[in-house]
Amino acid sequence: MNTLMEFNSSSLTTCHTFDKVVAFYTEHFSKVDRAIRNLYAAFLQEKAIIRPLQEYYESLNYELLQKWFEYRPEYQSDQQGYLISLFKNAKPRIAVIVGDGIRYEISEYIAQALEKKFKVDKQIMLADMPSETEHNMSALYVGNGEVLPVHKDREKRLTEISGKAITYMDLEALSYGDTADYLVLNYGDIDKAGEKLQQGAIKLFSEFELVLIDKITQLLNMGYQEVHLITDHGFVLTGVLDEADKLSPDATGTKEVHERFIRTIDKQSNSAWFGVKESHGEYNYVYAAKSHRPFKSKGCYGYSHGGVTPQEIIIPKFSFRKEKAATSELEVTISNKKESNEVIGDYFDIKLQADSKTTDLFASQRKVQILIYAGGVNISSSSIITMKSGERQSVEFSFQDNLEIIVVLLDVETREQLDVANIKKSNARDLGGLL
């Protein structure tokens, strides 16, 4: 609550360009957005408490929007074809998390949680208009203003244009042992929850943040040289909403009304709207209100996007990298990978080898653990193994009715992935030494 009530917006008066307004939002006002979101999560059902807080927030937001739309003509989205450009110039071992609805304040929280352990580069992207999923995911994956409704088609186009063998998966499916050189991970939980539960989803957002923190950490520990976090759009929250708060979609001619934007055939002259010329089916223009409030529509109110406020348009373009370690660690590897392509029988051995050439006193031993995966699921693991310089150890595991296994060797303390092996079960029968 203190962040909201003690916020000082005086520096907004010195913002005389669009870029300075953007900087004011990312450096200062995004904290207010986070504060009101947390207050909604705690008090949304207690109108006597939340309404005065919401009204104060809206007064601050009104000041911001006045400046935002004053310099809005300088706005130019840089979202079109972003992933194409990124992967064309990318080197192997790059992972990109493409979120749906990751507002800037969420990404800022994630970055603050990780910057103590990793190198964080915080850049911003300006989302396209209208700031909705189909339109802006197409902008990221395809570019040139082309909109592809089916996500698999966007992925196929990105692979074709970038010329890279990109692996696509849902973020939740990530597991140690994945070895793709170029990886795109989809994370749609924020937008899915928002669309389904509206403001009821607010209480879940902190869990989504923890998932992203955990997965970015895991990717870097798996050996990815850089992990990027981007999204299609942000969102606004309407809070306590009365019928009188909703905006009338008074457009002339044929129109298509959404909660945060309107498509029209004819050009409109409403000074309370911001519009651009954009063809979409039979429509020629798209308009959004110069406000965070929704149009009267068939949509569900609470969580929404599609408009052109800073909360919807200013989005993260963050990257994360590991700092070089100040001290060396004992190198431990799986030494029998070549012998594991065709294993006869229901059991297999994993042999570990610790480097014998180390001269660093602090690298004389290392605690490791072996994890066993089948179909992306962790089915078994070893106890913690302490490896000393030059030492060898062997651990036996069962296939557990699986034909193929991925073995992952982890550092116990850092959870860094040290080595990976693929183990395949042979179709030949184990004759127990009878031959």
Label the model's feature ranges:
Residues M1-L435:
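Feature captures the catalytic ectodomains and active-site-proximal regions of enzymes
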